């Protein structure tokens, strides 16, 4: 019995053990399966982790963009709110500051009314200047300081009444009293000055330069010096004695009780250097000023008056312009600097009074100039220089001693003077033709001298080809005039320019560079040929005065110039009333 129970217990135990073995085998199999499947799971987890990290990065970037967008939107809202507030503000007005008071208030002129208002703490009351523009808020209080007015009407200053008031002349000779703004506090005012005023406030703000005078004068000192003028050494010495000596040695003139000359007249045929000398005088004076004052750069003023532009159809305007010109000269001379007032073509505006050869406007213009020149007597450093090729037409009262004291005739150049003038334009540094250089041993100086000598001989030779005019005098005498009798510095310069142009054209055609003697010879011929017709249809008397031929009255003129082959016959010149071109 016991053994059966033992067997049953043993069988049960075996079954139990078998079941445990089966479970263990299943567990081992499960573990084996799980062990086999574990690499695939780890890869999947890694992939899921990477995807999660990418999603996190995208969300972070999106979050940053949203934050920036929100900030930008917030800034735009703030700016729009400020813009709305600014547009909703009432308009600001402007006024003119008149003065301040001890209690901190100020007077302003606005809208045609004079008001006493307060000033914003942001504005320094002490910095406000009389006549200055200020900004006003809605309550008409000063909130900002502006600049001075820059537009208005132009009037003429007549008289200074006291420290801050002036009497001015407006349109139609209307007189008005205005206040002077602080912008004019340090500006010296002279009678005739143009002032800018604001008519509503009654303030004068600025002195306006006289444009009408600026158009008539040229203040720049020319760069022409005496070294650039040829053939006029005697005339240059005369004008230097007349102008430079009184300025450089005033004590010697005072010691000898010698009054410096007030003016100089340069007269002579056209193109002989009158204007050139006047320019050189101003340049030389500037250098002398530098030597006297010890300054590196001297200063002188050259008022070149454009004579015909002085004339005006309105009565009294020309005289007023002359007064303004001399007023300018006095202003410049008051600083101790020499001033030259140069009237070119003086006969065009200061003709003899009562001559009947013009509209007789000179009946008032000449006396105005005379009074101005006499007014220069008590004023130092002002010199009047006139230039004319018709000195016989200038009013004698201008030419008398005490006005234009020194009269210098600028003659036509003779052969020696022509060499000097040629040397100013033909220099060794010019391109010279190799053949011409070879003829003179390669010396550039010798070649240039030979060119000048050939040109002068060609111009001044009394040969058949150089005959120009035959003049008949009132007494029946006849005289043959050659081209040399009509030579001038301007003609010499023109001849040299023609020769240089020929040299350039030859270089472009042949490739050989350089100026040649034959270029100068051809230029002389072309210049003479070009002047053949210049004296036609000219009244002989007028022509003689212009050309510098004085003496017996000329009644008949005949041209003698011949063609290149010498076959062209001479022509007579008609004597008619109308004037034409002058040589």
UniProtKB/Swiss-Prot annotation:
UniProt feature coiled coil, ranges: 2-90
Disulfide-bonded cysteines: none
Keywords, in A-Z order: ATP-binding, Chaperone, Coiled coil, Nucleotide-binding, Proteasome
Pfam families, A to Z: AAA, Prot_ATP_ID_OB_C, Prot_ATP_ID_OB_N
Residues the entry annotates as binding ATP: 271-276
Docks into pockets in the proteasome alpha-ring: annotated segments: 582-583
SMART domains: AAA
Function (record text): ATPase which is responsible for recognizing, binding, unfolding and translocation of pupylated proteins into the bacterial 20S proteasome core particle. May be essential for opening the gate of the 20S proteasome via an interaction with its C-terminus, thereby allowing substrate entry and access to the site of proteolysis. Thus, the C-termini of the proteasomal ATPase may function like a 'key in a lock' to induce gate opening and therefore regulate proteolysis.
Oligomeric and partner information: Homohexamer. Assembles into a hexameric ring structure that caps the 20S proteasome core. Strongly interacts with the prokaryotic ubiquitin-like protein Pup through a hydrophobic interface; the interacting region of ARC lies in its N-terminal coiled-coil domain. There is one Pup binding site per ARC hexamer ring. Upon ATP-binding, the C-terminus of ARC interacts with the alpha-rings of the proteasome core, possibly by binding to the intersubunit pockets.
UniProt-listed PANTHER family: AAA-FAMILY ATPASE, PROTEASOME-ASSOCIATED ATPASE
Comment, domains: Consists of three main regions, an N-terminal coiled-coil domain that binds to protein Pup and functions as a docking station, an interdomain involved in ARC hexamerization, and a C-terminal ATPase domain of the AAA type.
Protein name (record): Proteasome-associated ATPase
